[in-house]
C-alpha cells in the first residue's frame, strides 16, 4: 500500500514544537481528490435531480438520510486505483402509496444513477411528515379532546411529541405520542408533562389503535427551565491556540492526518486516520463512527414501559445537528465547518458550523523530578473534533480527541433536559417504595425515571495495514501457588480472538480487560505494533433476558465484538432498526463465523452510562461522559513526545 496518500509531503519534525503545533504541507492541485470529504450542497441538489429524473424513482418520492456513499475501501487501498473512486451519494427513497423502500446511489460528477436496490419490507427512520401526520391525527381524536377537558387543559396549550413505536412489526407504520404543556412562546420545555396519556397511531390508516391513560395527576408547575435562555451566552471563553491546517477536507495537525465528515444518520465520521512518522504515513483507522444507540427507560407505568429510542437508526444524529457557537460551545479559535442535508421533500438544507475543530491544553503530558532543582515536564496538546446532535430533550456532544502523545479518545457528552414524570404525590419517600423505586424525585412534583444510554462505536482499525490480530488481554493474580510463590504476581493472560463468534466479548473490570489490535509489522523490540482499545465507560443490560428490546439490540450484550470487514455491515442493530423484529445487525454479521487472525477486522465497542437522576441534573443536566480510548501499544519506540537526540540533558544545580 502506498503510504504517501496525497503526494510529496514536506519532511517534518513534529516533536518539541510550539504549543500550537501547526503543520505546513504542500498543496494539492486545484482538483479535489479526497473521496471522504463532506458532500456539498450542490452535490446533494444534483443527486436529488438525478434521482427524480430516473425512471425507477417513485412519482412522489420521499428522501431519507442522503449522505456520502461509502467510498470503496478496496479501491482506496490500491494507490493505482484511487483516482477511479467515483464521487457518490446514497439515499433511501420511499414510495408512500406503495409503502416501498429503495436505496438509490448517484454519481454526482457524471450525474447518473449507479445503483438501485429494492429493500425488503422495513420501516425507515421517522420523518417530518410522520410528525405532522401524527399531530393532526391526535388533535382530531375525540379521545384526545376528552382527556384534555377532564384535566382542564386547553388544546392550544399542548405540544404533541412523537416517538418511534418500538413495536416489532414492520408491516405497518406506527408511532407513539405523548403530551406536554407548552410555555408562553409555544415551546415544549419538557418540565410539564401531561402525565398518564399516550397513544399508538397507525399512520397509514390515520387511526389511533391503542389509547393508554392512567388516573389523572396534577400537572407540575413551570420550572426555572424557562429562564435558561437568559444565561445562554454566559461563560464565553477564548483560546490562545491556533487552528489546524485543512487541505481538501483533511485535517493536518502535529503528526495526525484524518478527514471529518458529517453523515445524515451517524453524525460525525472520522476517515483515514494516520500518524506521520518521518516521511511515512502509518494507517491507524480507516473509519470511526457511532453505529447505533439505545436508550431504554426503567419505569413500569403504562405510558413509560414502552419508552426506548434507537436515536441514530430511528431519528438520525447528523440530521439533528446543532450549530456550534464560538466563545460559548467551542473556543474562539475553533475552525467551524458547515454541513448540508436533504429534507424529506428533496430540499437541501445547510447547518452552519456543524463541526468544530480546535486545539486545547490537555494538562501535564509527562513530568519527572530528579531532585528538588531538576524538574522536567511537558504539556499535552489535544485536537478536538466535535459535533452536537439535539434529539428532543437530550443534547449529545460527540468528540474525537487526538493527543500529541498518540492517543485517540472518543468522548460522548450527555446534557440537555431529563425526561420527567409528574409525581402522584409531593411527599418524599425515604423508603423508596412505589414509583420512587424506579425514579428519583428531583422536585416535589417531578420524578426522573432511571434509564440507560448505550453507544455502539464501529471502529474499522487498520493498524499499520489491514492485516490485524485482535488479542484479549487480562491481568490477574495466579491462583496456582507455583506461579505465585510470594503472592505478589500479576500475570497477563493474552489470547488471540480467532473467529467472529469467538469475538463477542464482554468487559471484566476485575481483570482490567482490554483488547489489543496488532499489525503484522514488528516494532523495535520485535513485538507487533499495536493499539489497545479501552472502554472506560462500560454499561451492562438491566433489561430482562426475555425483553424483546434485547433481541432488537443485541449489541448491548457485548462491550466489544469483532467482525471481518464487510462494506455492507455498517449498523450494529441493522440498517432499519425502526420496528425491526430483532436479530439484525451483529447477529447476522457473525453468523458466518469468519476467521479473524491476520484479517481486516472491525471492532464494535459499546460504552454508555446508567443514569440515576439527581436534583442537580435539573432543570438542565451538567455534562456527563462516556469514553473509549485507543492507546498506542508498541506503535512507537518510546514516548512520542520525546526525541533523545534533540533533548539537552537535564541540568541540576549543585546544592551547598
Regions found by a protein language model. Name each.
Residues 102-132, 136, 140:
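Hydrophobic or amphipathic alpha-helical targeting/insertion segments
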Residues 32, 113, 117-127, 183-407, ...:
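Extended effector regions of multi-domain proteins
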Residues 36-77, 126-167:
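Short, non-transmembrane alpha-helical segments in secretory-pathway proteins
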Residues 9-19:
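Bacterial N-terminal signal peptides that target proteins for export
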Residues 17-27:
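Bacterial N-terminal signal peptides
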Residues 58-109, 155-203, 385:
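Exposed beta-strand-loop-beta-strand "reactive/processing" segments of non-cytosolic proteins
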Amino acid at each position: 500500500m502506498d503510504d504517501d496518500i496525497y503526494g510529496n509531503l514536506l519532511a517534518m519534525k513534529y516533536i518539541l514544537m510550539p504549543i500550537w503545533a501547526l503543520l505546513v504541507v504542500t498543496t494539492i492541485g486545484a482538483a479535489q481528490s479526497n473521496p471522504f470529504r463532506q458532500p456539498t450542497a450542490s452535490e446533494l441538489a444534483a443527486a436529488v435531480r438525478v434521482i427524480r429524473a430516473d425512471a425507477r424513482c417513485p412519482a412522489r418520492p420521499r428522501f431519507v438520510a442522503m449522505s456520502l456513499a461509502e467510498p470503496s475501501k478496496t479501491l482506496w487501498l490500491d494507490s493505482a486505483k484511487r483516482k477511479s473512486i467515483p464521487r457518490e451519494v446514497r439515499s433511501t427513497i420511499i414510495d408512500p402509496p406503495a409503502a416501498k423502500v429503495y436505496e438509490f446511489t448517484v454519481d454526482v460528477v457524471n450525474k447518473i444513477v449507479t445503483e438501485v436496490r429494492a429493500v425488503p419490507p422495513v420501516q425507515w427512520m421517522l420523518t417530518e411528515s410522520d410528525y405532522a401526520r401524527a399531530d393532526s391525527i391526535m388533535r382530531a381524536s375525540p379521545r384526545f379532546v376528552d382527556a384534555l377537558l377532564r384535566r382542564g387543559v386547553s388544546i392550544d396549550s399542548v405540544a404533541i411529541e412523537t416517538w418511534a413505536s418500538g413495536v416489532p412489526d414492520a408491516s405497518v407504520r406506527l408511532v407513539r405520542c405523548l403530551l406536554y404543556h407548552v410555555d408562553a412562546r409555544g415551546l415544549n420545555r419538557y418540565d410539564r408533562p401531561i402525565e398518564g396519556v399516550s397513544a399508538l397511531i397507525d399512520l397509514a390508516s390515520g387511526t389511533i389503535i391503542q389509547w393508554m391513560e392512567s388516573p389523572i395527576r396534577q400537572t407540575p408547575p413551570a420550572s426555572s427551565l424557562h429562564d435558561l435562555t437568559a444565561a445562554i451566552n454566559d461563560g464565553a471563553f477564548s483560546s490562545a491556540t491556533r487552528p489546524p491546517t485543512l487541505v481538501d477536507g483533511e485535517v493536518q495537525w502535529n503528526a495526525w492526518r484524518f478527514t471529518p465528515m458529517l453523515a445524515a444518520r451517524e453524525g460525525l465520521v472520522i476517515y483515514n486516520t494516520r500518524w506521520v512518522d518521518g516521511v511515512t504515513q502509518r494507517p491507524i483507522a480507516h473509519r470511526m463512527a457511532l453505529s447505533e444507540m439505545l436508550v431504554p427507560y426503567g419505569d413500569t407505568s403504562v405510558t413509560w414501559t414502552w419508552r426506548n429510542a434507537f436515536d441514530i437508526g430511528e431519528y438520525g444524529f447528523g440530521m439533528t445537528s446543532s450549530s456550534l457557537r464560538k466563545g460559548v460551545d467551542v473556543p474562539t479559535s475553533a475552525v467551524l465547518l458547515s454541513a448540508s442535508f436533504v429534507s424529506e421533500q428533496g430540499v437541501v438544507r445547510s447547518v452552519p458550523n456543524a463541526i468544530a475543530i480546535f486545539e486545547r491544553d490537555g494538562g501535564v503530558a509527562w513530568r519527572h523530578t530528579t531532585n528538588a532543582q531538576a524538574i522536567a515536564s511537558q504539556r499535552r496538546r489535544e485536537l478536538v473534533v466535535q459535533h452536537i446532535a439535539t434529539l428532543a430533550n437530550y443534547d449529545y456532544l460527540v468528540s474525537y480527541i487526538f493527543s500529541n502523545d498518540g492517543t485517540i479518545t472518543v468522548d460522548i457528552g450527555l446534557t440537555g433536559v431529563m425526561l420527567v414524570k409528574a409525581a402522584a404525590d409531593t411527599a418524599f419517600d425515604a423508603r423508596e417504595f412505589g414509583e420512587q423505586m424506579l425514579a428519583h424525585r428531583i422536585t416535589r412534583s417531578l420524578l426522573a425515571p432511571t434509564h440507560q444510554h448505550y453507544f455502539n462505536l464501529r471502529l474499522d482499525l487498520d493498524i499499520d495495514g489491514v492485516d490485524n490480530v485482535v488479542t484479549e488481554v487480562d491481568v490477574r493474580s495466579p491462583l496456582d501457588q507455583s506461579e505465585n510463590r510470594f503472592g505478589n504476581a500479576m500475570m497477563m493472560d493474552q489470547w488471540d480472538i480467532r473467529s467472529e463468534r469467538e469475538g463477542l466479548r464482554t468487559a471484566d473490570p476485575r481483570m482490567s480487560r482490554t483488547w489489543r489490535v496488532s499489525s503484522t509489522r514488528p516494532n523495535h523490540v520485535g513485538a507487533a505494533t499495536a493499539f489497545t482499545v479501552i472502554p472506560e465507560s462500560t454499561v451492562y443490560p438491566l433489561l430482562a433476558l426475555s425483553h424483546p428490546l434485547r433481541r432488537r439490540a443485541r449489541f448491548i450484550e457485548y462491550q466489544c465484538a469483532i467482525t471481518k470487514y464487510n462494506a455492507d455491515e455498517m449498523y450494529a442493530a441493522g440498517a432499519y432498526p425502526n420496528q425491526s423484529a430483532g436479530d439484525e445487525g451483529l447477529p447476522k454479521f457473525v453468523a458466518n463465523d469468519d476467521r479473524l487472525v491476520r484479517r481486516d477486522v472491525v471492532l464494535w465497542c459499546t460504552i454508555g452510562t446508567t443514569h440515576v437522576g439527581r436534583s442537580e441534573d435539573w432543570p438542565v443536566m451538567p455534562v456527563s461522559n462516556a469514553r473509549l480510548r485507543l492507546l498506542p501499544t508498541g506503535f512507537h519506540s518510546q514516548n512520542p513526545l520525546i526525541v533523545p537526540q534533540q533533548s539537552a540533558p537535564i541540568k541540576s544545580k549543585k546544592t551547598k
